[in-house]
Structures are given as structure tokens and as C-alpha cells.
């Protein structure tokens, strides 16, 4: 029997500022996988945002060149990291995405303010709104490049998974804020099957 080599994997935690990506990362990033994060770089090296972002980008590119596995967190509001994921897939990487969003950017604004009050990093309000709109508009491309993609609405106390792509098969789940038509618009996917993605019993 032929030995099939496992593809190298990238795990990406994506979504607008203040959606709650970091909480997902803490729980779901495998301990054996290197985690590349600009906020951590900024804190450790005491550099500014731009320098930290540039260092993180160089690290991701270096890992990609060496075909090494890694995990990273991104707002994904521009095509830069989307381009990296597309290149990675062409190189034979397996792409796993956890996308964390909210139903309204005002939630993100308040969460960032709460984070700052607790000593966390700030993001200007106008940037949160602008990035939210751009990030949401790119979701169909994120879904397309991912081998596995989970989308969670993290507006409430408990996150609610509204969508899952497993290879080429897609599933959705509904709640008050998310019905099928809205999930189709968000993801660009119309061929999907309803499934309990939240183990409600």
C-alpha cells in the first residue's frame, strides 16, 4: 500500500477586531504548532504596530518557504494574507480556518474598549468599522481557499457555529440572527445542507 504523505497544515484564526479570535486561538491552536502573532511580537520586542506586523509577515513567509506548519491570527480585511493562503494551498498546504465574527460591529467596538480598560491593545473606532466591512466582504474568498472552514457568530456569551465547510461539503445551522439566506450571502455558498453544528441535543 502506498504511503500517502500528510500535507503540511496552516491554521488561521480570522475575523474583525474585537470578535474574540484570541479566545479561540488559546483553545484551538495545537501546542505543537508554532503560533505567529503580531500582538505577541509587539509585546515581546516592545516595538510598534507596523514593525510587529512586518516581522510577523516575514515569519509567515519564511515558514511557507520551508513548508513548515504554523498557526496565525488575522483580521483578514485585505487581500495580503488571503494571497498567502492561496499560495500556500497551491504549494500543497492543508488550510484550516476558524472565522469569528459578530452580528454588528458596535459589539466589536465595545469589546475593544473593554480590552483597553483591562490593559489590552487599542484599535481606533473608525478602523474597527472599516475593517469589519472589508473583512466580511472577503469571507467568500476565505471559504473558497480553506479545506476546512468553521464560521462562528460570537456576539453572545456562547459562540454559535453558523457554517462548516469540510473539504467540498458545506453545512449550516440557523438561529434568530442567522437564517439560510443570510448565510448564503455571507459565504457565497448556496449548495449546503442544514445540520446541528452546535450539539443542542
Predicted stretch roles:
Residues 1-7, 63-64:
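Phosphate-binding P-loop
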Residues 16-17:
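The conserved Walker
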Residues 20:
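Conserved glycine(s) of the Walker
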Residues 23-70:
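Conserved substrate/cofactor phosphate-moiety recognition/catalytic segment
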Residues 37, 74, 99-101:
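Residue-level recognition of beta-strand->loop/alpha-helix junctions
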Residues 143-201:
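NTP-dependent small-molecule kinase module
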